[in-house]
Swiss-Prot record:
Listed name of the protein: von Willebrand factor
Encoding gene (name): VWF
Organism: Bos taurus (Bovine)
Pfam name, any one: C8
Expression sites by tissue: Plasma.
CDD domains (UniProt xref): TIL
Signal peptide span: 1-22
Length: 937
């Protein structure tokens, strides 16, 4: 037998050489060995032994029988194939049933599914389970036929019902005990997998009685002979001997109850065996009237790309390396969607794993997206930028870069660095209750004309204008300041600037798109590129956050932040376990609805940092979780996370906690002067119960007890007075009259408190080149020692909250370290080093020279880089770092975007990372100009 078999193999090689199979039906010969379970009870082994076996248990079909890294098991019941199971070692199992149900570890999963190097998907009507790492492919078709393919690495290393894969059919019937037998039932029964839960019965061959009429038997016999006589099958005779298939077909005639379709499984198996050898038998199904059944709306084809077009892949130009297979596919022009064929206009869209029908819309920030042809078509409006400070000096820039900077000084948070129309400065101090922590004590804002005043938002919720405390709400032209929740304030200036300040250190700064690309400071430059967020006043991007933060320091007498701990948990092991467990709520199902809208990872890092850095980690935990919940609420996802035993919020007497309340028109004052421009937003906090309003004492009262605010005066309920012969009376917080006159000015006067106290430093004399400055008592905007100019802050605006007398550098000179220097002698700074005027540095492909304290750089467009590091770390062209532990192959970069036909594509994937016996490696595939290059370590 071997010489004949070898001759057939050599002939197959010759016929598949380049140019040998050029016409219709040619297909590259597969390099994988194939085992098939088909028909009612037939098995075709890797070495092409065919036999019958009707099992009633679980049996080993194939696997790694040397190191036992994986096993493929067939599950039978009453002679019927029920499904396939794959076991990886002793602790992982996945089960695929003929009906498409999938269980992994006892849990239902849906396709597609990837885990531990295994990929489960639906392919042309087949359920396919494959693994490049383990070297196998298993398929179950719609008729319950099984196909198992093994790579040549398993040559002579497998065992089970599919044989031993060594090209010798003579030793295929080797039992689990190692003996050879000629009885297929003795062989197959030996591979039954009994367990304590399931004892496998020994299966016997069925009876051989014939229940088919002679006339039908003749018709079936003639159909079996088609394998030898029909021209459509004759094309493959040189590659696959039809005799064993004809013999098998004839043997099953008496046992089959499906009429003229009884031979069809054998004919299908012959066609698949030919395709395995590289020969496609187009038309065999029609010629033999054996076209396999397909789901409604689909049609059978002898050659279908396994990378079939679906609604989800409509916008992706896939790279398909696998050969075509026979199976069910959609008619030309239609796409597969969840098992049915549809027109492209019927394709749904997917967002955050949830499908949306055609025409559905979503709001994303300030834009609206509509589902069309499986793609989201979105408006392209520029959205407001948000800069956020939370917890222990955690920042989120306008371009969503998260960082921590714990310097103690006054810093420029954000400024219009083109027109200088506004500035926002923060003051940070050591926290009073925790000397190791840094808190934001106040926020100072300088607004555009005609105000030109300094507004200070103080710790505790107070507000000062040019050093004088003012009463809230404050409404002056475009400027509006109002209380939102408890001690929280909201400052609005027109529609372009908004500040939310909670009075305890949490700050949100929102700017309209008119400022995009125009800002500078700790919040970044608002240009959509995270890579240049650490831009300094000198014009260079710093790699270290400490150098970046120090460059925006406004006061000369503050120490630079030299180094800050990247992970306080490493310094406080006692709190590490508590931090990990407590902060895990952010990634728990409690916040699952928000994960697709706001990534929890930066907030999780901040939570661990704060809990470990805080003297009372539990208090900081609640603030950290609240910060993430607030970010979710801003994206329209409201999470009720507080519980009586976890971070319960204690409200003042008479107020109630609301997870989502509105700040608008909740006070007695708002009854007299409703704020029609208030933005209805969702805020967590303490509110008066429905029907009650907050009075000036902080108590919740019914409107009948609210005073009235009229013409700058306060009137108690039921007060009556005469105004120009009109009788006016106060009722329900509103001044009523016999006429319809307006109820006075909508702009309450600022209530001034104690006058600004001027601080001074006693100095009898100043040594040259210092000069003495004495603050005038009659000028609240005077500047003194607190505004000392240095080489680093010379171009930054000083916001004085109180003049300090003392010694300052003479005109034309500035302070550098502890000496006075001429302005033109100031150095430039980069990466913590000083550079003298005229010095040069190289930044990417540009050259920068130090001139007038700033770096003057060439403006070449430099090459950008995207990195894939380790198993799951990615660094985009624009500097975004993210974690994605996907187990499939993904497009790393391509220029096949939109209607662009494209010229290249780079794919990335990890292999062997879930196999203990294999080395994990990264594979990069480069497709360019019709060529393919693969790189792997």
């Amino acid at each position: 037998m071997f010489p004949t078999r070898l001759a057939r193999l050599l002939l197959a090689v010759a016929l598949t050489l380049p140019g040998a199979l050029c016409g219709e039906g040619a297909l590259g010969k597969s390099s994988m060995a194939r085992c098939s379970l088909f028909g009612a009870d037939f098995i075709n082994t890797f070495d092409e032994s065919m036999y019958s076996f009707s099992g009633d248990c679980s049996y080993l079909l194939a696997g790694d029988c040397k190191t036992h890294s994986f096993s493929i098991v067939g599950d039978f019941q009453g002679g019927r194939r029920m499904g396939l199971s794959v076991y990886l070692g002793e602790f992982f199992d996945i089960h695929v049933f003929v009906n498409g149900t999938v269980l992994q570890g006892g849990q239902h999963v849906s396709m597609p599914y990837a885990t531990r190097g295994l990929y489960l998907e639906t392919e042309v009507g087949h359920h396919k389970l494959s693994s490049e790492s383990y070297g196998f492919v298993a398929r179950i078709d719609g008729s319950g036929n099984f196909q198992i393919l093994l790579s040549d690495r398993h040559f002579n290393k497998t065992c089970g019902l599919c044989g031993d894969f060594n090209i010798f059919a003579e030793d295929d019937f080797r039992t689990q005990e190692g003996t050879l037998t000629s009885d297929p039932y003795d062989f197959a029964n030996s591979w039954a997998l009994s367990s304590e839960e399931q004892r496998c019965p020994r299966v016997s061959p069925p009876s051989s009685s014939c229940n088919v009429s002679s006339e039908l038997q003749k018709g079936l016999w003639e159909k079996c002979q088609l394998l030898k006589t029909a021209s459509v099958f004759a094309r493959c005779h040189a590659l696959v001997d039809p005799e064993p298939f004809v013999a098998l077909c004839e043997r099953m005639l008496c046992a089959c109850a499906q009429g003229l379709r009884c031979p069809c499984p054998v004919l299908l198996e012959y066609a698949r065996a030919c395709a395995k050898q590289g020969m496609l038998l187009y038309g065999w199904a029609d010629h033999s009237s054996c076209r396999p059944d397909c789901p409604t709306g689909m049609e059978y084809k002898e050659c279908v790309s396994p990378c079939h077009r679906t609604c989800r892949s409509l916008s992706i130009t896939e790279v398909c390396r696998e050969q075509c297979v026979d199976g069910c596919s959609c008619p030309e022009g239609q796409l597969l969607d969840e098992g049915r064929c549809v027109e492209s206009t019927e394709c749904p869209c997917v967002h955050a794993g949830k499908p949306y029908p055609p025409g559905a819309s979503l709001s994303r920030d300030c834009n609206t997206c509509i589902c069309r042809n499986s793609q989201w078509v979105c408006s392209n409006e520029d959205c407001p930028g948000e800069c956020l400070i939370t917890g222990q000096s955690h920042f989120k820039s306008f371009d969503d870069r998260h960082f921590t900077f714990s310097g103690v000084c006054q810093y420029l948070l954000a400024q219009d660095c083109q027109d200088h129309s506004f500035s926002v400065v923060i003051e940070t101090v050591q926290c009073a209750d925790d000397p190791d922590a840094v808190c934001t004590r106040s926020v100072t804002v300088r607004l555009p004309s005609p105000h030109h005043g300094l507004l200070k938002l103080k710790h505790g919720g107070g507000v000062a204008l040019d050093g004088q405390d003012v009463q809230i709400p404050l409404l002056q032209g475009d400027l509006r300041i109002q209380h939102t929740v408890t001690a929280s304030l909201q400052l609005n200036f027109g529609e372009d600037l908004q500040i939310d300040w909670d009075g305890r250190g949490r700050l949100l700064l929102k700017l309209s798109p008119v400022y995009a690309g125009r800002t500078c400071g700790l919040c970044g430059n608002y240009n959509g590129n995270q890579r240049d967020d650490f831009l300094t006043p000198a014009g260079l991007v710093e790699p270290l956050v400490e150098h970046f933060g120090n460059s925006w320091k406004l006061r000369a007498d503050c120490e630079d932040l030299q180094e800050q701990p990247s992970d306080p948990c490493s310094l406080n092991p006692r709190l590490t376990k508590f931090a990990d467990q407590a902060c895990a709520i952010l990634t728990s199902p409690k916040f699952e609805a928000c994960h697709s809208a706001v990534s929890p990872l930066p907030y999780l890092r901040n939570c661990r940092y704060d809990v470990c850095a805080c003297s009372d980690g539990r208090d900081c935990l609640c603030d950290a979780v609240a910060n993430y919940a607030a970010a979710c609420a801003r994206r329209g996802v409201h999470v009720g996370w507080r519980e009586p035993s976890f971070c319960a919020l204690s409200c003042p007497h008479g107020q109630v906690y609301q997870q989502c309340g509105t700040p608008c028109n909740l006070t007695c004052r708002s009854l007299s002067h409703p704020d029609e421009e208030c933005t209805e937003v969702c805020l967590e906090g303490c509110f008066c119960p429905p029907g009650l309003f907050l009075d000036e004492t902080g108590s919740c009262v019914p409107k009948a007890q609210c005073p009235c605010y009229y013409d700058g005066e306060i009137f108690q309920p039921e007060d009556i007075f005469s105004d120009h012969h009109t009788m006016c009376y106060c009722e329900d917080g509103f001044m009523h009259s016999a006429t319809s006159g307006a109820p006075g000015s909508l702009l309450p006067e600022a209530v001034l408190s104690s006058p600004l106290s001027h601080r001074s430093k006693r100095s009898l004399s100043c040594r040259p080149p210092m000069v003495k400055v004495v603050c005038p008592a009659d000028n609240p905007r005077a500047e003194g020692l607190e505004c000392t100019k240095t080489c680093q802050n010379y171009d930054l605006e000083c916001m004085s909250t109180g003049c300090v007398s003392g010694c300052l550098p003479a005109p034309g000179m500035v302070r550098h370290e502890n000496r006075c220097v001429a302005l033109e002698r100031c150095p430039c700074f980069h990466q913590g080093r000083e550079y003298a005027p005229g010095d040069r540095v190289k930044v990417d492909c540009n050259s920068c020279v130090c001139q007038d304290r700033k770096w003057n750089c060439t403006d070449h467009v430099c090459d950008a880089s995207c990195s894939a590091l380790g198993l799951a770390h990615y660094f985009t062209f624009d500097g975004l770092k993210y974690l994605f532990p996907g187990e499939c192959q993904y497009v790393l970069v391509q220029d096949h975007c939109g209607s662009n036909p494209g010229t290249f594509r780079v794919l990335v994937g990890n292999e062997g990372c879930s196999v203990p016996s294999l080395k994990c490696r990264k594979r990069i595939t480069i497709l360019v100009e019709g060529g393919e290059i693969e790189l792997f370590d």
